[in-house]
Amino acid sequence: MGRGFLRGVLTLLPLRSVLQVQHCMLVSEPDLPPKRPRNNLMAPPRIGTHNGTFHCDEALACALLRLLPEYRNAEIVRTRDPEKLALCDIVVDVGGEYNPQRHRYDHHQRTFTETMSSLCPGKPWQTKLSSAGLVYLHFGHKLLAQLLGTSEEDSVVDTIYDKMYENFVEEVDAVDNGISQWAEGEPRYALTTTLSARVSRLNPTWNQPDQDTEAGFRRAMDLVQEEFLQRLNFYQHSWLPARALVEEALAQRFKVDSSGEIVELAKGGCPWKEHLYHLESELSPTVAITFVIYTDQAGQWRVQCVPKEPHSFQSRLPLPEPWRGLRDEALDQVSGIPGCIFVHASGFIGGHHTREGALNMARATLAQRTAPVPLANAVVQ
């Protein structure tokens, strides 16, 4: 799928204003590495970071830098020696200095309180930046443009820049700075397989005879780079094209059903929820979308209820309670719709052998409620 198509898709996305984007990029794009204070100017550039126990943020910061052409062959210098760090072209997560003009990106000093929002007005994220977030802020647009094969001015770059920060880099910033996801109370379950946790486990254990961290840090850089590129590939090749499908489905919804509350997706399995909420907020339909119908991988039809919120298990309008947990003939008899396959016990999704049957399941559910739900009353994020 060509970049021209993706640009067309992105013209409808709620982007920041041009001035905000230009300001952000002005703040966040440093020059190429300065001249190195070394005799051999042909030597590869040096990226400095601290030695000893390593963390996800500096591993990601170094990995992102080495994806750039000017740092692709860079030497990673792991030390806390100020004299050795002074010889580095760029220093991350050590040194007690944040100075983009000198390519110094530490966040541990008492005076450092910067966030994506404070350094890039117009961006909403207020999590204190780690070295990963600082490198991403200053080099992210350039890096993404290179990886996506487009220019930094392409609106696709700014859109994916935001998605990658919110859904990948910000988590690393928060974990490294000790910022909890919740304000108070005990967590209901443990999260032990996060990216930061997996990087941490690449350090030597306390009782290993060999406490050298160099090999582990190289593995950590490989790990975070692979996951960053996997996530980027998803947003470029799956998330963006899905928006076009959802937009077209919304435009055609009255041809599916006169209520305008049922959306039919041409291709099942695409990530539709986030796009649906965003498009609803832009288009402001008079009634909220209640159901989405689509085919599954087996070619059967699904009718899925739209959640009240993006990550909620509560539906705007669940399938009728008497149908829930039933299958096949038992469901046919209760619903009065032949060819049913199942309805989930919570009522959030059901299946049918045919498109018309799935549509009838949605219509029958709409007919049993008292009145349509105005979009203003539907919880939309």
Swiss-Prot record:
Organism of origin: Rattus norvegicus (Rat)
Record flagged with keyword Nuclease: yes
GO molecular function annotation: 3'-5'-RNA exonuclease activity
Residues bearing PTM N6-acetyllysine: K267, K273
Domain of life: Eukaryota
Xref: InterPro entries: MYG1_exonuclease
One cellular component (GO) term of this entry: mitochondrion
Stated name of the protein: MYG1 exonuclease
UniProt main location, coarse: nucleus
Function, as annotated: 3'-5' RNA exonuclease which cleaves in situ on specific transcripts in both nucleus and mitochondrion. Involved in regulating spatially segregated organellar RNA processing, acts as a coordinator of nucleo-mitochondrial crosstalk. In nucleolus, processes pre-ribosomal RNA involved in ribosome assembly and alters cytoplasmic translation. In mitochondrial matrix, processes 3'-termini of the mito-ribosomal and messenger RNAs and controls translation of mitochondrial proteins.
Family from the record: Belongs to the MYG1 family.
Biological process, per Gene Ontology: locomotory exploration behavior; mitochondrial RNA metabolic process; mRNA processing; rRNA processing
Lineage, broadest ranks: Eukaryota, Metazoa, Chordata, Craniata, Vertebrata
Transit peptide per record: 1-47
Keywords associated with the record: Acetylation, Hydrolase, Mitochondrion, Nuclease, Nucleus, Transit peptide
Annotated EC: 3.1.-.-
Compartment(s) of residence: Nucleus, Nucleoplasm; Mitochondrion matrix; Nucleus, Nucleolus
